[in-house]
Curated annotation (Swiss-Prot):
The record marks A188, T189 as: Cleavage. GO terms for cellular component: cytoplasm. Substrate binds at T150, K176, T189, E271, N403, T408. The gene is argJ. The lineage of its organism: Archaea, Methanobacteriati, Methanobacteriota, Methanomada group, Methanococci. Pathway: Amino-acid biosynthesis; L-arginine biosynthesis; L-ornithine and N-acetyl-L-glutamate from L-glutamate and N(2)-acetyl-L-ornithine (cyclic): step 1/1. It comes from Methanococcus vannielii (strain ATCC 35089 / DSM 1224 / JCM 13029 / OCM 148 / SB). It comes from the Archaea. This is Glutamate N-acetyltransferase. The active site is at T189. Heterotetramer of two alpha and two beta chains. Gene3D superfamilies: arginine biosynthesis bifunctional protein suprefamily (3.30.2330.10), ArgJ beta chain, C-terminal domain (3.10.20.340), L-amino peptidase D-ALA esterase/amidase (3.60.70.12). PANTHER family: ARGININE BIOSYNTHESIS BIFUNCTIONAL PROTEIN ARGJ, ARGININE BIOSYNTHESIS BIFUNCTIONAL PROTEIN ARGJ, MITOCHONDRIAL.
Amino acid sequence: MAENFRIIDGGVTAPKGFIANGHKDRKYGVTIIASEVDAVCAGVFTTNKVFAHPVSLSKETLKNSDTFRAIIANSGNANCFTKGGMDDARAFVKKASSLLNIPESQILSASTGVIGRKMAMDILNREVEKAYESLKLESNNENAAKAIMTTDAFKKTVAVEFNVGEKVVKIGGIAKGAGMIAPNMLHATMLGFITTDIEISKEELKNSLQNAADESFNNAVVDGDMSTNDTVFVLANGKSNVNYRECIEEFDKALLYISTELAKMIVSDGEGAKKLIEAVLKGAATKEDAKKASMSIVRSLLLKTAIHGADPNWGRIAAAVGYSGAEMDMNNFDIIISSITSGKETYLVKCGEQLADEGTAELKMAQEIMKDSKIRITVDLKKGEFKNTSFGCDLGYEYVRINSEYTT
């Protein structure tokens, strides 16, 4: 790796002083993440105007408390748009509080699942108890990651460490998400939980998370639908005895790496997805233009289906950039397609001129690249110095099947 940190095992349990476990029984699951000591926390949430009760409750808790000890999350029900949903959200936290012996004011919560269905609190309370019993026996990051899965095909977890003198700082995370992914979380259905043993103020952590989320989670698109429950939390407990101000650049880069890897895992697990799309937009006149254009590429349903079918229909890329609203000159821009895995690449369009035409070597190479599972599309608008990278996935038959049967 180019960065000065190392990939390690353990996810949210890798940093000092954190434990986690979870339990899932068919539809419902519960994850508990706890710190041995008081921690500061930052959170980012969905900007959907229809938002879940745990989002409201966690925003309230973050505002009113300075220190935190635990995160609890459930899968199986979004607890959104339901009568008595806020009471259920509070009861969920209260149950965890009684078991963990941690004040309710120090517990943050999140939910994921079907919208508009009443929480089965009897089942959920049993799952909280089972998750707690599992946590008493052992700390298990894999179980914690599994318990929050819904339509996810695989667990999403990552951790890194870096040195500051003789001391070590660790950051770890878990996430869930496969469909309904197009977060726009101000400075996630997508849930992300990150832990670190850095010593940092609440305001510093908030700024670092906002910057990381803008470049990672907020650049991830599976289907263009924004969830009511998107949430990312970072807990920092200071157990490394390293202060953030000793390693600002290193920590921010490591947090961005964790966030980006989790975001890429989420889009790679898009319901029925087989391919990761990385859209790199450079040469834009403004940062806003760069993001609009790169997001337009990964949002395009026509492009997603072309990627699924390994069809190098570069016109769909050009069209997506063209309607994004970014400043461009159709007679002077580049489109390059490459394999992230093999490094093979070819121009499709260069300086506004089509190269990948019928019978050309460029088209043949593009067809070969499109068969890979990790594809990078690079567009150079030649209008300035701004750049942005967005992440998406292909869209195929399985996505329709999963979502047509979701509540049945």
